[in-house]
Amino acid sequence: MAKMGGEEDYPLYFGAGPELLRVAAGLRKSMTPAEKVLWERLRRKQLKGYRFRRQHPLYRFVVDFFCYEALLIIEVD
């Protein structure tokens, strides 16, 4: 299990396998223009102190943005 600094234990990737982790890493390197704009607003806890992760693997999917604290997924199309 992975941990975020100071938070309780939780399964950060919720069962995502190694291949999906590699796919997510590749997607982080090739974000769309819309994803880049939103990421500039979400990164470094700029949104009320919430921490977001980009191109985050969950189960069998890679979500554009994920905030565990708020249990929030954001998809940009």
Regions found by a protein language model. Name each.
Residues 43-73:
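Active-site metal-binding core of divalent-cation-utilizing nuclease and nuclease-like domains
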